[in-house]
Amino acid sequence: PLAPVVNEQDLQVLPVIAHVGYPQAADEYYQLLLALRPGRVAGLAEIVVNGQPFTVTDATEDELALTAWARILLEGTPIAMDGSWQLHRRRAAPEPVRFAKRFGGEQSNTSIMVGDAIIIKMFRRLEPGDNLDITVHNALNDAGISSVATLYGFMSGQIPAEEHIPVDLAMIIERLPQPRDGWELITAKAVDLVDVTDLVAGLGQCLRTIHEALRHTFSTVEIDGSRVADDMVRRLDAAVVTAPALARYRGTLTARFEKLRGRHLAAQRIHGDFHLGQTLLTPGGWRIIDFEGEPLKPLAERRLPDSRWSDVAGMMRSLSYATSAHARPTAPQTLTWARRASEAFLTGYGWPNTAEQDVLAAYEADKASYEIVYETLNRPTWVDIPLSAIRAMGQD
């Protein structure tokens, strides 16, 4: 257990960390939020405490349990019995807790909606150290950046191991008003090839503002372009094994990678997994969310500075993917729509100079080769979307 049990009437809410061990792999830790009620219910799990049986259920599926838990986090002052569980308040929450419920969409973490103005984002799989999403939101809030949600606070604890490893457990963040999912918005317009240039130009400006703030807040470094090129070539060769269709385009892709050799690339803290699904359009403009980086990468790698053009390339590829909503995603007029959208995004962000264009081109190629592997394994009917982009790269 991470903290004292939260009691409300006969309901008890208990956060715990599950330790999953593997004989030949690193251990993993997962956060669970349990609801306990006295008595037994057929078919449900139970535990016995001091001779008293309790039915155990998933508290994230129980609105009464979630509301009780949210009240403690936002209105109370919980203190762990062993000192391992802490609540860190950064800014005052805007309203008292009236109700809480779990967001029903598919997510890698658990989002709890608290009223109309707050989200508690509970991290399921725990990683030692500071959570990037918390770190970046806090820094951008301090810098006065309005294109991210307000961070009200976060919760931290310790993984129950001999070393008492510190870990972030959840963040309490603003629930943005009237949000429209960026992916759903742009793909809906792609169906009829409706012009989106003004929309995506604004998104480019938003990303540039965030990059500038991150550059001033966190340290910047130079990275070896040859090492970046080596990494891209290595990923491409591994991709060819999974997706043999890539083999004929290896020369096209590596030609882009090779232009990085002998260069020193400016690197900084970036978003790390930037695409339309990480954006929301609100009445106040674009907002960018989820600064945890690519979920499949280890935390240590996600913490490393990278070129800002990696984020730009991610959005360029995402705009290309938006054409999947059209009946003929690879038709000339559809590709023209995607090209104009990408150009507008770049205009909003700030067109790269000649040297930076080569960096952007390399990152685009790297992301497209990854996409072909992903589609080969998961959505074979979509393979032609990144493949058509790679074909076009060969014609540049």
Question: Residue ranges of each PLM-predicted region?
Answer:
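All-alpha amphipathic helical-bundle segments outside canonical DNA-binding/catalytic cores
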Residues: 198, 353-363
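Pre-DFG segment of protein kinase catalytic domains
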Residues: 269, 287-290
